[in-house]
Amino acid sequence: MNLIPTVIEQTNRGERAYDIYSRLLKDRIIMLGSAIDDNVANSIVSQLLFLESQDPEKDIHIYINSPGGSITAGMAIYDTMQFIKPQVSTICIGMAASMGAFLLAAGEKGKRYALPNSEVMIHQPLGGAQGQATEIEIAAKRILFLREKLNQILADRTGQPLEVLQRDTDRDNFMTAEKALEYGLIDKIFTNR
């Protein structure tokens, strides 16, 4: 069951009810709290574009608690984060794994954060293929291409050498907030406001 809390706000015209995500959006906060698929990506991209249209100079904050998901959906979010004018701050709450970790690192350098008990996990892309041998070969080439592309972007975002990224993403690589800070995936650990 997916319950979305409602908040009541007092205005000069009386009370107004918002779902919590709409209320957070007014404060330029976007929640990424699920696996990343095309629907989630479309929602996040739409919110980023909307907030840019409201004020292109003011930061946007994305809170991430995600197990990861689709590479193409995640890249749609990543490209939009880089494309829009406002700086995008990222904050890991809980777990940022796989594409969630990639998006955490994609925040504006100096504005990538994690809470003290959060975890970050990086690994190589996952995929599978079936069908004729030529189709399997095409799928394998694509996933190897994506692996190199994602590793290169992460190397640029973290300051780690590409060879280190290739080694460290070979298997699931879980990190505490402290380790993610040392690695360059985040810039600061938040303990309070």
From Swiss-Prot:
Keywords: Cytoplasm, Hydrolase, Protease, Serine protease. It is found in: Cytoplasm. It is an enzyme of class 3 (hydrolase). GO terms for cellular component: cytoplasm; endopeptidase Clp complex. Coiled coil: none annotated. It comes from the Bacteria. One of its GO terms (molecular function) is ATPase binding. It catalyses: Hydrolysis of proteins to small peptides in the presence of ATP and magnesium. alpha-casein is the usual test substrate. In the absence of ATP, only oligopeptides shorter than five residues are hydrolyzed (such as succinyl-Leu-Tyr-|-NHMec, and Leu-Tyr-Leu-|-Tyr-Trp, in which cleavage of the -Tyr-|-Leu- and -Tyr-|-Trp bonds also occurs). Its EC number is 3.4.21.92. HAMAP family: ClpP. This is ATP-dependent Clp protease proteolytic subunit 2. It comes from Bacillus cereus (strain ATCC 14579 / DSM 31 / CCUG 7414 / JCM 2152 / NBRC 15305 / NCIMB 9373 / NCTC 2599 / NRRL B-3711).
